[in-house]
């Protein structure tokens, strides 16, 4: 049976990648269908109830700068906000928020249902309609054919999902949801480089059975930060604390005694899990010299007693889970509401994707999220946004959006994935970016919002707000340059705790390491200073890091001369005999789109790149 209504874009999956993909496509004016196995789980936080963190917060800011929904949603559902690395440089400072997962999901659902050009449909997708090498649509569980020009697959952990608790395992996309086995089989019939990964989650606890008086209180920041550039702290719901406790020697002994039933250590699970989010049993074995590991006790929301003990992800048997949980300070009488588990699932080699996240071998099919080997809500959402934008661009015959490594963390992530691939769940960190001083949280809108305007992703009101903000920044910088402090100014010397030996502008004073905008504002200048903390930080960072940023821009310009040189997919690398056999094989396998991508393939040396450039010049001449 074929449905008569035709959509231009179909998005499969309603998680963090799927929702951003569908909203982006629809915002660009393209008729879009989001199809999910269960509409009640749209925007579900399957694991930890939090958004942001080091590197991840940067992605959320970039998604927001491009008109995405994640930042706005967490501003309306976040029950604790903190700035991480606050004492470090601005490049690595990051926002993190604890979420009320019920509120979060509700806000996502509201955004989806009220977006023009977007329809929702509840069904599992069992098959793809592919003719030749071109996607034509999808087939649902009930045999309904839905036709589309582009399809974006955001399957999360559902493809061939198997859940493990001790020696028991069963099929599932996550606890309580069926897997997508039929779709997994369909994709496996194509040569797309399928492999398996695993992730895990801790047991959820009944907060009424915990003794918080035995734990350390962890409060949020004051003043409260916001994620969205147009967000206001008044949008935040009631704020509540988190808590910290620790495992102990007895906890670790109980875990060791239960390893005989661990699917990880008995070989039932062979897939690789997240390096930076290991299970508690993995931590106990790998760091056997330690008698304690930190646990963040995180509330799941304002209207539930459920608690998420961050740091004890596990797939041990239920009995061992309960025993080791009850050995932890404050958890002595804890009751488990949901057991922890590990889940294995299919992912596909992201080196088989174009920079747009379109599958190289199947035109019009895009992959986003965990299907590409990433882990985390933020990484998934960023890929969904990119895939949604580029699917719409292809429909509208616009140039694709291809963010570069020096423009965004989204660009860093996609470039890493499509050039290097991954054999473990990929997580974003600031350390992955070469130019992280340019890729700060505070300037994500400056970097990306003009592109969002060009693509039709933001409203005119949002664009006006952006222009007002940066006009104010430029006006204030101009004022600081034209406001002078005289030599030996007594008030300035006292406030700055240093002698001003000759005349300085406020602009020059702000370059000093121990002088920030708020200190400067105490000096009598005869004119008002800004009171908006966001604008203060932007101005501070632009002035303080101007010299370093200038040097990085010079480096980038040199690099870009060859970075964007296009490599035709028709090049026969085996014919370039000056290249080593290894390099020829790798270039043939990956078919990089640019010299920059080729240079980041493992084993491709700078000498090989020089040979390629000579080859291209010879070919042109």
Swiss-Prot record:
InterPro entries: FAD/NAD-bd_sf, GIDA_C_N, MnmG, MnmG-rel, MnmG-rel_CS, MnmG_C, MnmG_C_subdom, MnmG_C_subdom_sf. NAD(+) binds at residues 273-287. It is found in: Cytoplasm. Disulfide bonds: none annotated. Transmembrane segments: none annotated. Keywords: Cytoplasm, FAD, Flavoprotein, NAD, tRNA processing. Its cofactor is FAD. Homodimer. Heterotetramer of two MnmE and two MnmG subunits. NAD-binding protein involved in the addition of a carboxymethylaminomethyl (cmnm) group at the wobble position (U34) of certain tRNAs, forming tRNA-cmnm(5)s(2)U34. Belongs to the MnmG family. This is tRNA uridine 5-carboxymethylaminomethyl modification enzyme MnmG.
């Amino acid at each position: 049976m074929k449905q008569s209504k035709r959509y231009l874009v179909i998005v499969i999956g309603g998680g963090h990648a799927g929702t951003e993909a569908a909203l982006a496509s629809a915002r660009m004016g393209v008729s879009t269908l989001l199809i999910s196995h269960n509409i009640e789980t749209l925007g579900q936080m399957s694991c930890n109830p939090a958004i942001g963190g080091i590197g991840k917060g940067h992605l959320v800011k970039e998604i927001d700068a491009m008109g995405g929904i994640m930042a706005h949603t967490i501003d309306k559902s976040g029950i604790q906000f903190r700035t991480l690395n606050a004492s470090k440089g601005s490049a690595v400072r990051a926002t993190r928020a604890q979420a009320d997962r019920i509120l979060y999901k509700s806000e996502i659902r509201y955004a989806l249902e009220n977006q023009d050009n977007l329809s929702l449909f509840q069904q599992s997708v069992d098959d793809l309609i592919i003719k030749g090498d071109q996607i034509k649509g999808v087939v649902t569980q009930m045999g309904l054919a839905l036709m589309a020009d582009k399809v974006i697959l955001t399957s999360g952990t559902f493809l061939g999902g198997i859940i493990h608790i001790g020696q028991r395992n069963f099929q599932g996309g996550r606890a309580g949801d069926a897997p997508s086995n039929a779709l997994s089989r369909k994709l496996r019939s194509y040569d797309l480089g399928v492999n398996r990964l695993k992730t895990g989650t801790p047991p959820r606890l009944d907060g009424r059975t915990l003794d918080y008086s035995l734990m350390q209180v962890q409060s949020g920041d004051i003043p409260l930060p916001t994620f969205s550039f147009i967000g206001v702290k008044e949008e935040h719901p009631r704020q509540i604390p988190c808590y910290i406790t620790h495992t102990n020697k007895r906890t670790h002994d109980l875990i060791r005694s239960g390893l005989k039933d661990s699917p990880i250590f008995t070989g039932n699970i062979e897939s690789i899990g997240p390096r930076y989010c290991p299970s508690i049993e993995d931590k106990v074995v790998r760091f056997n010299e330690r008698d304690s590991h930190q646990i963040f006790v995180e509330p799941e929301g304002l209207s539930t007693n459920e608690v998420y003990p961050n740091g004890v992800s596990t797939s041990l048997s239920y009995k061992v889970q309960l025993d080791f949980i009850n050995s932890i300070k404050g958890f002595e009488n804890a009751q488990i509401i949901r057991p922890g588990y590990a889940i294995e699932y299919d992912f596909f080699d992201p080196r088989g994707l174009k920079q747009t996240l379109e599958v190289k071998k199947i035109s019009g099919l895009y992959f986003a999220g965990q299907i590409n080997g990433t882990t985390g809500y933020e990484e998934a959402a960023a890929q969904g946004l990119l895939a949604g934008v580029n699917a719409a661009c292809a429909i509208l015959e616009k140039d694709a959006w291809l963010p570069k490594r020096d423009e965004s963390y989204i660009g860093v992530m996609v470039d890493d994935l499509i050039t290097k691939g991954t054999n473990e769940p990929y997580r974003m960190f600031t350390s992955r970016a070469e130019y992280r001083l340019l890729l700060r949280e505070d300037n994500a809108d400056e970097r990306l919002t003009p592109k969002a305007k060009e693509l039709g992703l933001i409203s005119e009101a949002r664009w006006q707000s952006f222009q007002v903000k940066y006009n104010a920044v430029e006006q204030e910088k101009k004022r600081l340059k034209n406001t002078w402090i005289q030599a030996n100014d007594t008030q300035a010397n006292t406030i700055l705790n240093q002698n001003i030996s000759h005349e300085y502008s406020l602009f020059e004073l702000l370059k000093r390491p121990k002088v920030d905008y708020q200190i400067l504002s105490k000096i009598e200048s005869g004119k008002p200073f800004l009171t908006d903390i966001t604008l203060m930080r932007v101005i501070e960072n632009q002035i303080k890091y101007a010299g370093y940023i200038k040097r990085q821009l010079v480096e980038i310009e040199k690099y870009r001369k060859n970075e964007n040189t296009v490599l035709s997919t028709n090049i026969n690398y085996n014919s370039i005999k000056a290249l080593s056999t290894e390099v020829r094989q790798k270039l043939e396998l990956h078919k990089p789109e640019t010299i920059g991508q080729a240079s980041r393939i493992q084993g491709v040396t700078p000498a090989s790149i020089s040979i390629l450039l000579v080859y291209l010049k010879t070919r042109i001449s």
